[in-house]
Amino acid sequence: MAPKNHQKYTIKNDIQHVLDCSDVYIGDTAPTARSEWMFDDAVNQIVWRPTTTPEALVRIFVEVLTNAVDNIERSINGGHELCKNIKVDVDLKTGKTSVWNDGQVIPVVKNCDNGVVQPPPPTTEQDRLAYEKLNREYIHTIIFGHFRTSSNYDNETDQVSGKNGVGVKCTNIFSSWFSVVGVDPDRKLKFSQEWRSNMTKSGAPQVVKCALKTGYTLVEYVPDFARFKLKSYPEDVESIFKKLVVDASAFFPNTAFFFNGERTVVKNAVAYAKLYYNLNETAVDSVVIDYKDSKVVVVGSATPLPPVSFVNGQITPAGGQHVTNWSRVIFGALLAALNGKKNVSLTKADIAPYFQLFIHSKVSKPKFDGQNKNCLKSPKVEAHLDATILKKMLKWKIISTIQDKVVKSKEYLALKKIECRRTPIVKVDGYDQANRLGPDSVLIVCEGLSAKSYAVAGIQKGLFNKKGRTYFGILPLRGKFLNVKNTTPLKIGQNKVVSDFIKVLNLKFNLDYRKATNYATLNYGTLLILTDADKDGIHIKGLILNLIHELFPTLFHRQGFIYSMETPIVKILHKKGQPTLFYDENSFEDWRAQHPELKHFKYYKGLGTIGPADVAAFFGSKVVRYHYDEATDAAVNSVFKDENANERKEWLGRFNPRVSQWCLDHHREAVIDLKISDFMHHEMIKFSYEDCRRSLASCIDGFKESQRKIIYAVRKKFRSNSTEFIKVAQLSGYVAEQTDYKHGEQNLCETIVKFAQDFVGANNVQLLEPDGQFGTRLEGGKDSAAPRYIYTKPHKILPYIFREEDDPILEQSSEGEPVHFVPIIPLVLVNGSVGIGTGWSCFVPQYNPLELIRYIEARLTSQDSEALLPAKPWYRNFTGKVAATGPGKFTTFGRMKQVDADTVRVTELPVGMWTDRFKDQCYSLIESGQLQQLVNESTVSKVDFTLKKLQDISALKLTTTLHTTNMVLFDRENVITKYDTIGDILDHYFQTRLAFYKVRKNHTIAQLKNTIQHNETKLKFIEKVLTDHSFLRQDDAAIVSILEKENFLKVDNSYNYLLNISIRSCTATAVEKLQSTIKGLTESLIRVQQTPTRQMWYDELQQLKQVGNWSEP
């Protein structure tokens, strides 16, 4: 059907078509709000900022700049003068914009004289006339003033930015004035021509002679601002244009680029990439990939940016084939590596925001999506990532960020599986659910089943104006509570203790509990933590607070949600009145020092030791309410995050265990408010310190806490009889009974066994004697028999190292155990020490006891002791070699000899390599074809391997390394100290032991004097009885009166020790014996008084050497 209205059809010329359809050629001419990359001179970086500068105004500049940049490649490929300079100038006031370049020049000739064979003339008269006119035009005129003309039409033309024959003509069309100047040094001519009014008016070409030896092309124009709805250039144009010049200078380093007279220097592609990042930001990781015709810079940064890409020097904002292929290769390799290590599947979308790609590809005959050339359509760009570059990238800091943020966020999604719907009954082992669930109910989380019994008894008394099972639920923790900051969500979900805790409270991940509606979904509105009053109890509180901080942080903002119930550690019993309770060990020790008469007190080792009678008095008497403050986040992270280890070292180094920064005993109120940050700094540090006490040895006695408890109990048990063996299992039970040890008797058994081991690499000096299989060098002691089958007793050397004379003056803890022993040789160097504590670890190698004794003897006799410092570690019965191989570094070598051309025999292994491990290593070499045969003739104590046709001796790994760079020990004040050399350790030990002898000497003199006086008084009393027969016929009061008048010595303010003397003690024989005793004591007193302390130590060392019977090093 014909249209009702006639439609008008018009034919537009090329110029009018471009002007009317600008979006087809150069984009929108109207000012529109968008964001654009710009160069900010103030901070010397590329920034992403909003702008209203028309897209088309930028495009017409790009067309001119691209022509100049294309000249770089043309000059190289054409064998012409290289393009050395490109100069851009922009006048914001007048709008005049110019681009100047040298290199390959446009010849100043007419098209017909260009030397190029022209196509046959058109057949129509009109086309023939146009053809002849074009042939009479200069080449400059054709390129810049005629549509669909371009040298790039030539299919042989390679790496340039396009070949539509439009390009720079668009600049001319959208300019009120346009000019081109060209110098041809070969023809010694200079060409110039101007156009006006959107290329509709052109001036005649001007050609003059020119003697310049360097040719150039200069394009200048003034935009037709009216067509862009502007009066002049916007202010940010300069920043936008300069950024485009900087782009080009980055990828063509052999050409100097200038913008408004100033050179834009970008050293390389990496320097260009870093222009996109804040200079104040921590230095980012980067790598450059050069592959075929592409140069790619990959930057690892948490600042998400889209890929920045170029083709032949021209920016491609929408990317294209080159971006797609490089992204696929780079992110594909990263994903394969990351997903291979994790239990979650990452995608490109997960990791791409953490990597910035800068891609520049030189592409032959590129095809774009349009004249704007925003996106490369073809050809396909090849991409490849070398394995060494991938390995480097996997070590970047940003990988840890991805693992922390992206991987964990995905893993936390998996954690949601442990959430449970709110059901009437939550089934968890040992859990007693409150009869009413909701915000008014209280969940008591306690430490094990024994603590549960305390809680069940206590809720009958009640707390928070509630009592009984109506509002109280009880969850006993049955297992290890994880530090959730240093583990994967997968492991968190697999931990039954944590998952039970989450289920019972009905906690939901990513829920904001600051909102009342979300808070009301919890099964309990209050969490009450009930643990033992020891350091492990503090640790459990900290772990629960850490879990909430990491997984449910908004609960910290619910004031009054988290409480802990405290119980006393000591109860003082008085004859009259109420008992005194202490919740802090230091405050108890202070009080005890002021009350030396204290005899009766009860020490509570845990909730299980609190009897039913005490529950009513203790339950709820001290409750701590935890508060979030601005320092909480940093405090929790500093205590629990692995990366804060160095911070914890400083933290522990400042800690004084004898001073409580926060003390419950200073608070009389029932509910005490405590900031979580204060709990971390003042309470958690007690556990961290205690953890180090368990893991790190003392510089003075060489013992960790459990080792010290064992020796204390052994000396106590075998004081009267050291000849009978005892089962290791029985001894561990005795140690646990006699000391304040709470960590399982199995650990004690292992430590007892190690004290008695005598194979190479174990003890240089055994402290316990073995009877049974205590382990061999076959498995490094792991092959010992079960503790119930093996026996031990003190080694004969034990009393010579730990002198009985020392016992009365050893500093004791509140449990009556030594804070540390003071052996007569530095055991920490004799037997070495290895341990890992909170923030600290330690390794001290072993040294020959004879060498250490010689050093001490030299210091005692004021000889040159420095020369006698042990030069290297020493291990008893080790027949290999120990050599210094660097500062603080020693290497131990096994022994091997060549039997014949095909056979070697190994007769010693390096320290720390066990026989069976070496055997397994050799079998692996046989399986891999590096060894033909192994003959094993080793015994439990000797190494003997014969190897046939070994290809590479180094594969045996017959060396181990010992270091003296991490000798971290407790000093005499129990402060964690890192010792740089064994000389430092020896000096600290020597000063301590020598001072100890002075104290011991004074104590011994006082004790001898007291004993002599006591015996002399007894002798005087006996002699009085024997000479005054009427003396005992009087009553007690008269006798006491006489004794007082005659100044008889009282003991404990009485004369009972005299009045209770038996008749047998009053015989002449007894008197003679007592006189002999007094004489012996007096001689001992004189001997002690006359013996210098240094001589005392020296003499005891001689006794030790005789018993030790050690071999020379």
From Swiss-Prot:
Entries under InterPro entries matching the protein: DNA_Topoisomerase_II (IPR050634), HATPase_C_sf (IPR036890), Ribosomal_Su5_D2-typ_SF (IPR020568), Ribsml_uS5_D2-typ_fold_subgr (IPR014721), Topo_IIA (IPR001241), Topo_IIA-like_dom_sf (IPR013760), Topo_IIA_A/C_ab (IPR013758), Topo_IIA_A_a_sf (IPR013757)
Protein name: DNA topoisomerase 2
Catalytic activity field: ATP-dependent breakage, passage and rejoining of double-stranded DNA
Swiss-Prot/TrEMBL site (Transition state stabilizer) positions: 788
Pfam families named in the record: DNA_gyraseB, DNA_topoisoIV, Toprim, TOPRIM_C
Binding site for Mg(2+) 1: 447, 532
GO annotation (BP), single: sister chromatid segregation
Residues the record lists as binding ATP: 67, 101, 150-152, 162-169, 371-373
Organism: Invertebrate iridescent virus 3
GO molecular function terms listed in the Swiss-Prot or TrEMBL record: ATP binding; DNA binding; DNA topoisomerase type II (double strand cut, ATP-hydrolyzing) activity; metal ion binding
